[in-house]
């Protein structure tokens, strides 16, 4: 099983992606800001449940920074397709992580009250099949929290490096989620603050045919704190409403029978 899973990963992600992610995930403004938004949304989900200590699964947990945060809200477990990612999680002291693919989760039916898939389903050839697998492991009325990249015209080098299959609009995300057997309770765009800069940079790079190995380097130390605070501040808006556009799209949905 391990070998089959590992060979499904693009070579770039096998050799370079996870070591870089492990180094930057705790401090890079984008990950810090996103994690604060996710934290606020998970707290919102937990408030709707009868159990104050829910069982939570992070699908595609990567090197584990989000999983550590999720442990503040319940019994958090993780699964990732990469043996390298699982090892990095263990280096963080996380021992509730399994090796497995999103399309074949190594868990029993009706196991979790909350499942997160944070920038995961865009990697899948069949995103609806992956969402149905998430539905399988969710308990009745359990919630899934999805975070995905938005708008195909924002396609950039990080999409190529990360082996993305697509970026979403809110209608396309909602359609996939509902087709998989969920009722969407809330959805919005996110990261509106950096929408225009990202659009400009990626458009110029395409126009000039510039290439970069990764976008992780966009982490100017003097601006890292302000950038992360600006991104994270969106959680106060998202707690009360929606954003009309952004670099990402986010969705909370409930499993229905």
Language-model-derived ranges and their functions:
Residues 123, 127:
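Di-metal (Zn2+ and/or Mg2+/Mn2+) metal-binding site signature of metallo-dependent hydrolases
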């Amino acid at each position: 099983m391990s070998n089959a899973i590992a060979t499904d990963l693009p070579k770039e992600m096998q050799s370079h992606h996870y070591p870089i992610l492990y180094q930057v995930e705790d401090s890079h403004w984008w990950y810090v800001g996103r994690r604060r938004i996710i934290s606020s949304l998970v707290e919102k989900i937990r408030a709707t449940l009868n159990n104050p200590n829910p069982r939570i699964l992070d699908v595609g947990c990567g090197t584990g920074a989000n999983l550590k945060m999720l442990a503040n809200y319940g019994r958090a477990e993780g699964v990732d397709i990469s043996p390298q990612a699982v090892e990095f999680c263990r280096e963080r002291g996380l021992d509730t992580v399994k090796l497995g693919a999103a399309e074949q989760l190594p868990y029993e039916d009706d196991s979790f009250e909350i499942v997160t898939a944070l920038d995961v389903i865009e990697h899948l050839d069949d995103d609806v099949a992956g969402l149905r697998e998430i539905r399988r492991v969710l308990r009745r009325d359990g919630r899934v929290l999805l975070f995905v990249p938005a708008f195909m015209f924002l396609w950039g080098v990080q999409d190529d490096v990360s082996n993305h299959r697509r970026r979403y609009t809110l209608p396309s995300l909602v359609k996939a989620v509902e087709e998989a057997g969920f009722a969407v309770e809330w959805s919005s765009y996110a990261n509106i603050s950096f929408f225009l800069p990202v659009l400009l940079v990626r458009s110029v790079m395409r126009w000039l045919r510039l290439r970069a190995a990764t976008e992780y380097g966009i982490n100017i130390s003097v601006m890292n704190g302000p950038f992360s605070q600006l991104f994270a501040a969106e959680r106060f808006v998202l707690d009360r409403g929606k954003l009309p556009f952004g670099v990402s799209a986010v969705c909370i949905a409930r499993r229905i029978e």
